[in-house]
Swiss-Prot record:
Enzyme class, spelled out: transferase
Organism: Phocaeicola vulgatus (strain ATCC 8482 / DSM 1447 / JCM 5826 / CCUG 4940 / NBRC 14291 / NCTC 11154) (Bacteroides vulgatus)
Binding-site residues for UDP-N-acetyl-alpha-D-glucosamine, renumbered to this chain: T14, G15, G16, N128, R169, S201, I256, Q301
Catalytic activity: di-trans,octa-cis-undecaprenyl diphospho-N-acetyl-alpha-D-muramoyl-L-alanyl-D-glutamyl-meso-2,6-diaminopimeloyl-D-alanyl-D-alanine + UDP-N-acetyl-alpha-D-glucosamine = di-trans,octa-cis-undecaprenyl diphospho-[N-acetyl-alpha-D-glucosaminyl-(1->4)]-N-acetyl-alpha-D-muramoyl-L-alanyl-D-glutamyl-meso-2,6-diaminopimeloyl-D-alanyl-D-alanine + UDP + H(+)
Protein's recorded name: UDP-N-acetylglucosamine--N-acetylmuramyl-(pentapeptide) pyrophosphoryl-undecaprenol N-acetylglucosamine transferase
Localisation per UniProt entry: Cell inner membrane
Chief location bin: membrane
Matching InterPro entries: GlcNAc_MurG, Glyco_trans_28_C, GlycoTrans_28_N
Amino acid sequence: MEENLRIIISGGGTGGHIFPAVSIANAIKEQHPEAEILFVGAEGRMEMQRVPAAGYPIKGLPVAGFDRKNLLKNVSVLFKLVKSQLLARKIIKDFKPHAAVGVGGYASGPTLKMAGMMGIPTLIQEQNSYAGVTNKLLAKKACKICVAYDGMERFFEKDKIILTGNPVRQGLRNHHISREEAIRSFGLDPSKKTILIVGGSLGARTINNCVMEGLDKIKASGAQFIWQTGKIYIGEARAAVAQAGELPMLHVTDFISDMAAAYSAADLIISRAGAGSISEFCLLQKPVILVPSPNVAEDHQTKNALALVNKNAALYIKDAAAKEALLDKAVETVKQPETLKSLSTNIAKLAFTDSANVIAREVFKLADKYRKENGR
């Protein structure tokens, strides 16, 4: 009797890694309901809560990222890396997967490295337009590399690359909420132009500061705003709003659980340039002003943003210029129907509609080949 299909999925750290990982897992289960899926994440990171909430088991590794500013701290990081590799090896030995998938984030390095060394076929998903260091190292042993942008042969062997796009949260693809209903759900006025402000799942200091320091501009704008601050910024955000007086045109929250409603409500979005978020904007045809984070490896968010800007599919403001320009540009743009229409049309051309299923099918091919060769 053939064993159930077993797949390890590793990575996390931010929603930009976790949401695609869960989408891939869901696609695997839809096509193979009997499949057993085990996630491997980093202890203390967001995936340790989000993955179980999505219905999947997860094991944690004590892995941490390298500190590029304080090299002495990396002594403990190296110790954790070695410990994580040994633990990943034990997890793989016990679970006996037929394939392993890496989606980026701290845990994917030791997990995929050990899987490759143990003869397990590996697939990595590179979400950004500029490949990260970990994925560039893992790519040498990977069987397949799923990417979201053209031109990734700069980083990876051409024969391994499959252009799939980035999987997005499942609820976004199947939402049926109208703009009017969505806006009312945030206590706002459907007759007014609405700007959604997000900074990724962890929040964004620069974007939040722009809003807190620009509450007078928001009052006078004639538009209305849905503002997701991130949990660590919500206290000071609410204090700033309370001090500014009555702001009926502003809905502020630390986290939006129903992003389908938030996107439906938005005529324009202000966001960081994480790969997962950009994939969602493309799929939903949303005009966006991107403010790339300067605090990411290889400045990959700027490269993500420019990939859209060069196709007239998004607007772009540097982090350093945001304080002076961001809110003014947003209010100006949301009042220009032709600009919004053009941005929407162009960003829609970059959408991939079935990424998770395409990636799942590649995982099945690797697993099937492994099972035939190993009698499992």
